[in-house]
């Protein structure tokens, strides 16, 4: 805020990093501007009273400031800072007195321009002085925290340099006490920070500090006990570097600087998902504005970048061959659909007549993009499912080998563990390419980076344990690294679950169970002429059975976690019951039968004849079917609470449930039967044709939203009527797909009648606007569009009598309603287009060509206000199926965290007492 006149001081509001400081500055700004600005006085309020209020506020500020300076914790250690505070407070006092005097002079003669300017200048000087004092006080608070960081750094350095275990233990106890003391102030500071990214970075550094302390302790003790081993030194150096990095990050964020590595910098949306979103937004171009020289290269460039990013996922190691082929096919389909759309754009250049070719081309590109998204998502879920199938066994096998003291086996297991770690890190990073959830992406990328650095140290700890298998210190060190690894893997798994849709996960799990079953069948039917070959076949069957069991239990864990966050209902109980059946019955039955089969193969596999192999193969298939059917039952239970629009599958139309299409097939269908259900039973070919028309209607709907929804309905009946007509037409088109609020033919007829009524009102109002406007081409266009609305409303009334024709062929009912459904959708689209053109023409006629002597304005053309934004920005998820976590109630842990924050904000005195108590304990301990 600059100061004018004699004022030469400036302060930048962006320099304020504390919410409390910002709040106090804002409050004082309101007090001062109440005097210097024109505003209505409240009943009983006087201008002299405002000056008195300001005087009291300044006096209270000076008193509070003096008390705070007297209690400043650095009063003895840094007298220079205290002097600066006194000087800043003195400036507040001086400028406050001047402001009160000039303010009093101004309110007594408020018509004086000179006195107003002097009062305004004095107010700015006072605000600048107060802001400088508060910013200085805040910087001293930061210095106090930084001093605590330096204490922790010094203690950590002493512990690293310690040469006895007793010193290490004593210094570690002191370090933990200092970290706990620092943690209280850091949490308080994090809540008070204005910028969210600084708050996230500070909390991430705090978390890293707390997690690194136990590793530093065990690594240092191990190095003191076994200094002759290079692995011990590497562990200690790693933890020392991590400790220093965390402390440096804390200090940088506290000082308002950018740390070398921050948590917030990982929150970047992947290039591929960004390209797909941009591409879908760019393909819808007004044909009149299409330019071949710029639009074609731009769209083709976006398409090729999408294809390139998709190819990197398709070529990844764990991508299934069939999924790869689908991705390649969809990329080619997307290219072809884009070229056809661009060709239609170029054909329409200079042509005024509208046709369905461009909307149909846009709908086709959207459909191909949607299909490509689905295949890419499920390819990534393939990777996640394989990499995170068993995250514990590689490390457990490594530790067991190390405890046995077998170096060769330990190094082999270490290599396998490192490969496993590299796989989960690469899969985690790959998954971020298709997620727009910034928070989850930040957690995934940050945790993956930590795991990448931690994995070699876990291997070093295991090799050290292999060299000293009886050392208690080495065992404790290994245990600490193991716990740290599992904690971070658990966090990474949770974050990946947050960006994975349940439908994708279950669909992929079903497919993987089938793959594992086929792998087991190959192990059963493979020929074995030697014991080694038979053992290899047995291992194949055993691994396949273990994978199936692991995938089934993983399904149970994921679905149970989702249901735990939903309120109890019949739906959740149905899903939980399906999970219980899989977990407590089917998995155990499968494990028992698979184990018995493996034992039989191990004992008699060399003597199996083809008939025996076929019997054992059927036994394995039946056992796998138990698990596969149970997983499918869980998926069906989850879909019971979904509408058709929520299901993103290879088939656009889904049956209501098992047996829904055949239920009561032989009964006679009456006139009053729910026609919506009959529309769902249309032949697939008719459904596809109807869906193509609906896709075109959605393109027109998008144009409607872009042209009409930007206007405010308040005071504009044209916009209100148009929006209402659009909503009803959407319901009518949904009826042709067998969903939506309209159930019977009578519902559709009533909806058409309501559209006709709204169309008549719109026609009358727009015609009056046209009559009041000057003669122009716009007036002629408006009247022409109104005649189209009348025509299409009449056609819609006729088409609304859509009814499914039912004929019986043998024992099956054949439903057909293609012609009437197609006519209904096409008429609704034409009507919607006419409404859009009418709104545009009415706006131009009423604002640009209105006659000067016309009556009062019939409608008010105002831009719609921005939609209300939630206090907490919701996470954006491009997936079709939303995870239950996005509609779940507030988690108990989150409620507790909010309670803790409030307690920190309101209970500062208790924190201060706790800090004083810890400080006194440290002093007594040193004495």
UniProtKB/Swiss-Prot annotation:
Xref: Pfam families: Vinculin
Which controlled-vocabulary keywords does the entry list?
A: Cell adhesion, Cell junction, Coiled coil, Cytoplasm, Developmental protein
Coiled coil as UniProt keyword = yes
Give one GO term, molecular function aspect: beta-catenin binding
The UniProt disruption phenotype note reads: Worms arrest their elongation at the 1.25X to 1.5X stage.
Cellular component, GO annotation: adherens junction; apical junction complex; catenin complex; cytoplasm
Keyword DNA-binding in the entry? The reply is no
Positions the record marks as coiled coil are: 319-354, 672-696
According to its UniProt record, where is this protein mainly located?
A: other
Q: Where is this region: Disordered?
A: 901-927
Biological process (GO) annotations held by this record are: cell migration; cell migration involved in gastrulation; cell-cell adhesion; cell-cell adhesion mediated by cadherin; cortical actin cytoskeleton organization; embryonic body morphogenesis; regulation of actin cytoskeleton organization; regulation of protein localization
The entry's localization annotation reads: Cell junction, Adherens junction; Cytoplasm
**Tissue-specific expression:** Epidermal cells.
- Family classification: Belongs to the vinculin/alpha-catenin family.
Its quaternary organisation is: Component of a core catenin-cadherin complex consisting of hmr-1, hmp-1 and hmp-2; the complex localizes to adherens junctions. May interact with hmp-2.
- Write out the function statement from the record: Required for cell migration during body enclosure and cell shape changes during body elongation. Required for proper localization of other junctional components, such as pac-1.
Q: Do you know which PANTHER family this protein is assigned to?
A: ALPHA CATENIN, CATENIN ALPHA
Name assigned to this protein: Alpha-catenin-like protein hmp-1
């Amino acid at each position: 805020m600059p100061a004018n006149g004699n004022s030469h001081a400036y302060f930048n509001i962006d320099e304020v990093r504390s919410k409390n400081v910002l709040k106090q500055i804002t409050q004082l700004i309101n007090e001062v501007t109440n005097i210097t600005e024109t505003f209505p006085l409240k009943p009983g309020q006087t201008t002299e009273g405002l000056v008195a209020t300001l005087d009291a506020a300044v006096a209270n500020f000076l008193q509070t400031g003096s008390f705070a300076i007297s209690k400043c914790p650095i009063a003895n250690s840094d007298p220079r800072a205290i002097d600066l505070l006194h000087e800043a407070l003195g400036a507040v006092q001086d400028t406050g007195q001047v402001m009160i005097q000039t303010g009093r002079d101004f309110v007594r003669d408020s018509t004086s321009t000179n006195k107003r300017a002097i009062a305004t200048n004095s107010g700015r000087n006072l605000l600048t002085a107060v802001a400088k004092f508060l910013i200085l006080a805040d910087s001293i608070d930061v210095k106090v925290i930084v001093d605590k960081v330096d204490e922790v750094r010094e203690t950590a350095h002493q512990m690293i340099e310690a040469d006895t275990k007793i010193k290490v233990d004593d210094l570690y106890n002191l370090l933990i006490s200092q970290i706990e003391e620092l943690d209280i102030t850091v949490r308080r500071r994090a809540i008070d920070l204005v910028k969210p990214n600084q708050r996230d970075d500070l909390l991430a550094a705090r978390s890293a500090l707390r997690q690194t302390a136990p590793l530093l302790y065990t690594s240092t003790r191990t190095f003191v006990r076994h200094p002759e081993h290079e692995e011990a030194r590497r562990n200690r150096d790693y933890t020392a570097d991590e400790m220093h990095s965390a402390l440096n990050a804390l200090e940088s964020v506290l000082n308002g600087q950018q740390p070398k590595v921050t948590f917030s910098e990982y929150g970047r949306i992947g290039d591929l998902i960004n390209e797909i979103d941009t591409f879908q937004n760019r393909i819808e171009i007004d044909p009149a504005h299409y330019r071949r020289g710029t639009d074609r290269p731009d769209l083709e460039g976006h398409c090729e970048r999408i294809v390139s990013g998709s190819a990197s996922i398709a070529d990844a190691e764990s991508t299934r061959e069939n999924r790869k082929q689908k991705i390649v096919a969809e990329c080619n389909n997307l290219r072809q659909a884009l070229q056809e759309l661009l060709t239609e754009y170029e054909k329409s250049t200079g042509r005024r007549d509208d046709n369905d070719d461009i909307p149909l081309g846009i709908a086709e590109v959207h459909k191909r993009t949607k299909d490509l998204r689905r295949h890419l998502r499920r390819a990534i879920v393939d990777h996640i499912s394989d990499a995170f199938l068993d995250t514990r066994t590689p490390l457990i096998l490594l530790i067991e080998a190390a405890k046995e003291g077998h170096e060769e086996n330990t190094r082999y297991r270490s290599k396998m563990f490192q490969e496993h770690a590299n796989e989960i890190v690469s899969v985690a990073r790959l998954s971020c390419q298709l997620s727009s959830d910034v928070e989850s992406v930040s957690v995934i990328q940050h945790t993956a980076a930590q795991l990448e650095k931690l994995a070699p140290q876990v291997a070093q700890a295991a090799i050290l344990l292999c060299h000293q298998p009886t050392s208690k210190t080495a065992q404790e060190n290994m245990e600490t690294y193991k716990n740290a690894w599992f904690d971070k893997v658990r966090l990474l798994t949770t974050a990946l679950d947050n960006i994975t849709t349940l439908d994708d996960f279950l669909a992929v799990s079903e497919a993987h169970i089938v793959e594992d079953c086929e792998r087991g069948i190959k192990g059963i039917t493979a020929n074995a002429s030697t014991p080694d070959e038979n053992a290899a076949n047995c291992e194949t069957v055993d691994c396949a059975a273990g994978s199936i069991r692991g995938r089934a239990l993983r399904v149970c864990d994921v679905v149970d976690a989702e249901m735990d966050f939903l309120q109890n209902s019949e739906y959740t109980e149905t899903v939980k019951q399906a999970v219980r059946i899989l977990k407590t019955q089917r998995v155990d039955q499968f494990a028992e039968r698979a184990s018995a089969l493996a034992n039989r193969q191990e004992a008699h596999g060399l003597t199996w004849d083809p008939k025996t192999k076929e019997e054992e193969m059927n036994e394995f298939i039946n056992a796998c079917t138990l698990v596969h059917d149970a997983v499918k039952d869980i998926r069906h239970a989850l879909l019971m609470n979904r509408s058709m629009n929520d299901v993103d599958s290879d088939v656009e139309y889904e049956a209501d449930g098992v047996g829904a299409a055949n239920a009561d097939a032989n009964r006679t269908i009456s006139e009053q039967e729910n026609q919506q259900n009959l529309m769902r039973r249309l032949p697939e070919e008719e459904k596809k044709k109807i869906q193509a028309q609906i896709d075109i209607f959605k393109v027109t709907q998008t144009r409607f939203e872009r042209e009409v929804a930007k206007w405010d309905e308040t005071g504009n009946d044209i916009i209100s009527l148009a929006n209402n007509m659009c909503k009803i037409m959407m319901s009518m088109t949904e009826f042709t797909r067998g969903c939506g609020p309209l159930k019977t033919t009578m519902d559709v007829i009533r909806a058409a009648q309501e559209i006709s009524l709204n169309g008549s009102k719109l026609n009358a109002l727009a015609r009056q606007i046209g009559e009041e406007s000057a003669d122009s081409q716009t007036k002629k266009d408006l009247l022409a569009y109104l005649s189209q609305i009348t025509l299409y409303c009449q056609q819609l009334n006729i088409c609304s009598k859509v009814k499914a024709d039912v004929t019986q062929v043998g024992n099956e009912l054949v439903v057909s309603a293609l012609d009437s459904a197609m006519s209904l959708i096409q008429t609704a689209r034409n009507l919607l287009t006419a409404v859009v053109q009418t709104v545009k023409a009415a706006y131009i006629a009423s604002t640009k060509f209105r006659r000067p002597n016309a009556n009062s304005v019939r409608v008010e053309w105002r831009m719609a206000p921005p939609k209300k934004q939630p206090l907490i920005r919701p996470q954006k998820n491009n997936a079709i199926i939303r995870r239950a976590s996005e509609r779940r109630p507030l988690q108990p842990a989150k409620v507790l965290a909010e309670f803790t924050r409030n307690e920190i904000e309101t209970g500062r005195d208790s924190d201060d007492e706790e800090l004083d108590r810890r400080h006194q304990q440290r002093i007594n301990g040193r004495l």
